[in-house]
């Protein structure tokens, strides 16, 4: 996929870029693999806002993507590469030998007509899904499970991948895109290759309106609010924070304070943190 740049016909178009969608081969999604997606306006069941700066956006239909890849001992053919508005990566439409259709994340290099498989005996080939114990060291992988049978949870965004560094008993040592090194059960599955659409991070949205189409609302600084709205608010002119540390809107220390639960069960599987040197 390449990035196209618009002519500066207006202030909003100046420096605006977008995907050229050259890899997309089918514009309409598979109806049998769609589900309804309702907007919540970032409010919960009691009407309270649970996430700031989220609301609106274009109407979308959810694509049912297969993150588990448990249909073994059969071959699927890639029929199309499609756009998915719910994620940064593109998706590939598979048709199995028995006629079943499914979506998977489209890895880099996967093309229409390619054959993919899943299972312990699958080849080490882009798009194939195998248990981590069957994947050789040094291989780039994505869509990695954390619990057997739950489906892939790690390395699913556009352009991301992880690398197998080694094997230690019933665990496999994996280095993630962030630099974090962690242990993952060898029975968990992963897909070979990198997630495609890597240039997505280079897109310049150009104007606020495009972000509104994506469901993003304005992010207002606390320092320009009133003191009853934010701990940084108030004062005459451009006033400092006025506290020993920057604070969140709810009065908790932020900007450097670790928020991960020290007692979280999965901490023991992290060999090296993403910020470790």
From Swiss-Prot:
Region of interest: Disordered: 212-277
Pfam families membership: Ribosomal_L2, Ribosomal_L2_C
Q: Is the keyword Transcription regulation in the record?
A: no
- What GO MF annotations does this protein's record show? rRNA binding; structural constituent of ribosome; transferase activity
Query: Which Gene3D superfamilies does this UniProt record tie to the protein?
Result: 2.30.30.30, Nucleic acid-binding proteins (2.40.50.140), Ribosomal protein L2, domain 3 (4.10.950.10)
The job of this chain, per UniProt, is described as: One of the primary rRNA binding proteins. Required for association of the 30S and 50S subunits to form the 70S ribosome, for tRNA binding and peptide bond formation. It has been suggested to have peptidyltransferase activity; this is somewhat controversial. Makes several contacts with the 16S rRNA in the 70S ribosome.
Cited NCBIfam families? rplB_bact
Family, according to the entry, reads as follows:
Belongs to the universal ribosomal protein uL2 family.
Q: How does it assemble?
A: Part of the 50S ribosomal subunit. Forms a bridge to the 30S subunit in the 70S ribosome.
The name of this protein is Large ribosomal subunit protein uL2
- Species this chain originates from: Leuconostoc citreum (strain KM20)
- Whichever gene encodes this chain, its name is rplB
């Amino acid at each position: 996929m390449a990035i196209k740049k618009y002519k500066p016909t207006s202030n909003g178009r100046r420096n605006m870029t977008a995907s050229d969608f050259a890899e997309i081969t089918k514009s309409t999604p598979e109806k049998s693999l769609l589900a309804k997606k309702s907007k919540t306006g970032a409010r919960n069941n009691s009407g309270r806002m649970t996430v700031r700066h989220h609301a609106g956006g274009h109407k979308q239909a959810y694509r049912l993507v297969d993150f588990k890849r448990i249909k073994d001992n059969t071959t699927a053919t890639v029929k199309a590469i499609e756009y998915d508005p719910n994620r940064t990566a593109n998706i590939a439409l598979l048709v199995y030998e028995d006629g079943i259709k499914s979506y998977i994340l489209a890895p880099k290099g996967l093309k229409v007509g390619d054959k993919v498989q899943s299972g312990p005996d699958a080849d080490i080939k882009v798009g194939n899904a195998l248990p981590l114990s069957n994947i050789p060291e040094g291989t780039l992988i994505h869509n990695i499970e954390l619990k057997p049978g739950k489906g892939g949870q790690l390395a699913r965004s556009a352009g991301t991948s992880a690398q197998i560094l080694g094997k230690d008993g019933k665990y496999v040592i994996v280095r993630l895109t962030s630099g974090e090194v962690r242990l993952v059960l060898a029975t968990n599955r992963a897909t070979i290759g990198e997630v495609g659409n890597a240039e997505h991070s280079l897109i310049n949205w150009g104007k606020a309106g495009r972000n509104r189409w994506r469901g993003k609302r304005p992010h207002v600084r606390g320092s320009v609010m009133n003191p009853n709205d934010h701990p940084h608010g108030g004062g005459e002119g451009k006033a400092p924070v006025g506290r020993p540390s920057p604070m969140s809107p709810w009065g908790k220390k932020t900007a450097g304070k670790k928020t991960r639960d020290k007692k979280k069960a999965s901490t023991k599987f992290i060999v090296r943190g993403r910020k470790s040197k």
